[in-house]
A protein has these predicted regions:
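Alpha-helical scaffold segments that flank or form the walls of functional sites
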Residues: 1-13, 33-40
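Short acidic/histidine-rich active-site segments
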Residues: 18, 166-180
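Extended substrate/RNA-proximal surfaces in nucleic-acid metabolism proteins
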Residues: 19, 24-136, 191-201, 207-224
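Histidine/acidic-residue-rich catalytic or RNA/ligand-binding cores of hydrolases
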Residues: 24-28, 117-124, 144-160, 177-191, ...
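His/Asp/Glu-enriched short active-site or ligand-binding loop at hydrolase and phosphoryl-transfer sites
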Residues: 133-146
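Conserved active-site loop/cleft motifs that coordinate metal ions or position small ligands
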Residues: 135, 167-173, 200-202
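Conserved short secondary-structure transition element at the edge of the structured enzyme core
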Residues: 154-172
């Protein structure tokens, strides 16, 4: 993955394996080992983290807080159907909001699947209040994606993000090396909507890192 990112001219690569709950994913020992992995390879910066599962309507996460805090450079939470029972719009929205409010979480992954209906205004408002990033997922927009209605759902979410000045992060969801750095669908969507570049935090390495750092400082103050 790092070599592919370097070959494509990227300056930073985030590697976020699925946490426990997804069949066949990494166990706890893998994430503990992240502390010793180099943060620079092939001339690019590396950030290691996890896409942690939201496992119930109360926003419970599938990874212990001590592991999240001590081992992860990037802390993402998302809903995945193998480990989540779909509820009502209110229940699904609450699951996301509780994860957004969790000070351990930096990013909410692909909140764009019509199979998990949510209230987008509530989600965007919570993201703004808690300084949590919402992901625009390139894989969701692909015609082969198992997620349903992502294009329309992301249009709704992005319009609200623009109106409320809520920043987003673009993600490739690359599960193999050739997909690293591929944002083709995201680029089309953002261009069609004329979405402000200044609200896309990974437009530069410095902006992304600063956004995550600022998010954690604000949330830390809120906890103290």
């Amino acid at each position: 993955m790092a070599k592919a990112a370097a070959d494509k001219g990227l300056k930073l690569l985030g590697i976020t394996e699925h946490a426990q709950g997804i069949p066949g994913t990494c166990d706890e020992i893998y994430f503990h080992n992240m502390r010793i992995i180099p943060r620079k390879m092939y001339g690019i910066d590396l950030m290691f983290g996890s896409e942690i599962n939201i496992i119930d309507h109360d926003g419970t996460l599938s990874m212990e807080e001590k592991i999240i805090e001590k081992t992860l450079d990037i802390r993402i939470a998302g809903i995945h159907l193998p480990c989540y029972e779909v509820g009502t719009v209110t229940q699904n929205t609450n699951a996301y909001v509780k994860a957004i409010e969790n000070p351990m979480i930096d990013i909410i992954s692909h909140p764009d699947d019509s199979r998990i209906p949510i209230d987008y205004e509530t989600i965007v408002d919570a993201a703004k209040e808690n300084h949590t990033l919402l992901e625009i997922n390139n894989s969701s927009l692909d015609s082969l994606s198992s997620r349903v209605g992502a294009w329309q759902n992301l249009q709704i979410m992005l319009q609200m993000c623009e109106e409320k000045k809520v920043p987003v992060v673009a993600g490739t969801d690359a599960h193999f090396s050739s997909a690293v750095g591929v944002f083709d669908h995201v680029e089309v969507l953002l261009q069609e909507m004329n979405f402000p570049e200044e609200l896309v935090v990974n437009r530069s390495v410095d902006v992304l890192k600063q956004e995550i750092l600022q998010h954690r400082e604000i949330r830390k103050i809120g906890r103290d």
